[in-house]
A protein has these predicted regions:
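Serine-hydrolase catalytic core recognition
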Residues: 19-22, 38-40, 46
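Substrate-binding/catalytic lobe of Class I Rossmann-like enzymes that use SAM or dcSAM, i.e.
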Residues: 41-152, 159-160
Length: 160
């Protein structure tokens, strides 16, 4: 039985103090032939700080990792990093569409939330889109396995 695991949009909420625990748990959950995919917002440069406004109003306790912060923890867990994909502009487009959808439904939103929330959410979506377009924010997809022979040598298998 192959046990594959996927984590989407969760790793940025784990916190650096728990990275090793996270990857150790991924290792424990995989069979010897299992593969894990970790999909997370990340930064292309060195580790940094979370924007204070984002931390206070949008993602309390969240942290955007640099790839350099994760790889050493992957290695210590016994997992092999078998592939990394860096999606540079995809999430900017996602945020842009979310903002359009937000305004397409603004009357419904205002029935539930006040004006302050609406302004904050617009600011979050707009500033995040700009960050993905103009700064070092990206999305990483890390493919991990216990056994590097489990994963094909190229990405051609994804096209089948």
């Amino acid at each position: 039985c192959i046990r594959d695991r996927v984590s989407v949009g969760m790793f940025e909420h784990v916190g650096t103090a728990h990275y090793q625990e996270f990857f150790n748990k991924v290792y424990d959950l995989l069979n010897d032939s299992g593969v894990a995919l970790i999909h997370t917002i990340g930064r292309l440069n060195e580790p940094g700080n979370t924007d204070p406004w984002i931390d206070k109003y949008i993602f309390p306790g969240g942290y955007i990792p640099a790839l350099s912060e994760t790889v050493s923890r992957v290695e210590k867990s016994g997992l092999s990093l078998t592939d990394v994909q860096v999606l540079r502009f995809h999430y900017a487009e996602t945020l842009k569409r979310w903002r359009y959808n937000f305004y397409d439904n603004i009357d419904k939103v205002k029935e539930i939330y006040d004006e302050k929330f609406c302004r904050m959410w617009d600011f979050y979506l707009s500033s995040s889109q700009a960050s993905f377009e103009e700064s070092t924010l990206v999305v990483f997809q890390m493919q991990l396995s216990k056994n590097k022979k489990t994963v094909p040598d190229s990405r051609n298998y994804m096209l089948a």
